[in-house]
């Protein structure tokens, strides 16, 4: 089977794990007036890519992919625990937990997942989404670079989808933003794959604060 098909499957917004219900703090930033137009959205997303995704979340995900591919389950669980510990708010923690749970349910219902993989998934209580994604990538023999690229694409696409619901920006404006951000997505991919353990860093205090405020936001469309 062409490895492109399962890659597109995992990156698809149609994957039934509920990603469309989360904005990862973007809705809160809009409500506070931090984000209000295309330029401010681009700055918000660029900062997320540079200060969080490229140098922390994507490198952790790459390590989980490598560990799963090599059958190093203790390493996989170690990096998954690092990821869970970095969820600084209840909403961000619940987001990853819920989508991880939903992806486990999906994989358990598919013939591709063998018994060994099912057993390993049972070894982590409430597995976060990137851990389950890594197991899925192993199941379909996806290489690390392609899987991280798909992960980054899924993150950006979901952010733009949330933006179109929460701001009066149409699909064309979102596509223009996508064109502007794709080179930064390339940079994020290369940074993530080259990141050493000593370089892992997460400096998005604004995201954490926005996420905390969102927990008590009076009117909201999204769960984060």
From Swiss-Prot:
Q: Which Gene3D superfamilies match?
A: Urease accessory protein UreF
- Which compartments does it reside in? Cytoplasm
Which keywords accompany this UniProt record? Chaperone, Cytoplasm, Nickel insertion
Gene Ontology cellular-component terms for this entry are:
cytoplasm
* InterPro entries found in the cross-reference section: UreF, UreF_sf
Return any one Pfam family short name: UreF
Gene Ontology molecular function: nickel cation binding
Keyword Membrane assigned: no
- Report the sequence similarity comment from the record: Belongs to the UreF family.
**Quaternary data:** UreD, UreF and UreG form a complex that acts as a GTP-hydrolysis-dependent molecular chaperone, activating the urease apoprotein by helping to assemble the nickel containing metallocenter of UreC. The UreE protein probably delivers the nickel.
For this protein, the record's HAMAP family field holds:
UreF (MF_01385)
Question: What role is this protein assigned?
Answer: Required for maturation of urease via the functional incorporation of the urease nickel metallocenter.
Report what the protein is called.
Urease accessory protein UreF
Tell me the organism. Nitrosococcus oceani (strain ATCC 19707 / BCRC 17464 / JCM 30415 / NCIMB 11848 / C-107)
């Amino acid at each position: 089977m062409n490895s492109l098909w399962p890659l597109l499957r995992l990156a698809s917004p149609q994957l039934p794990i509920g990603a469309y219900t989360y904005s990862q703090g973007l809705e809160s930033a809009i409500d506070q007036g931090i984000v209000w137009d295309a330029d401010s959205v681009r700055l918000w997303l660029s900062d997320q890519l540079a200060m969080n995704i490229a140098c922390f979340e994507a490198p952790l995900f790459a390590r989980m992919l490598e560990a799963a591919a090599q059958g190093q389950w203790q390493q996989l669980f170690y990096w998954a625990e690092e990821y869970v510990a970095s969820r600084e708010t209840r909403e961000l923690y619940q987001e990853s937990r819920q989508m991880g749970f939903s992806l486990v349910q999906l994989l358990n219902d598919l013939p591709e997942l063998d018994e060994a993989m099912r057993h390993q998934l049972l070894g982590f209580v409430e597995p976060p989404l990137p851990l389950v994604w890594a197991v899925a990538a192993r199941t379909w023999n996806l290489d690390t670079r392609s899987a991280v690229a798909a992960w980054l694409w899924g993150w950006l696409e979901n952010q733009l989808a949330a933006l179109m619901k929460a701001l009066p920006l149409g699909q064309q404006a979102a596509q223009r933003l996508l064109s502007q951000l794709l080179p930064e997505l390339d940079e994020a991919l290369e940074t993530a794959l080259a990141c050493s353990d000593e370089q892992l860093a997460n400096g998005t205090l604004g995201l954490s604060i926005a996420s905390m405020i969102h927990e008590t936001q009076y009117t909201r469309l999204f769960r984060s």
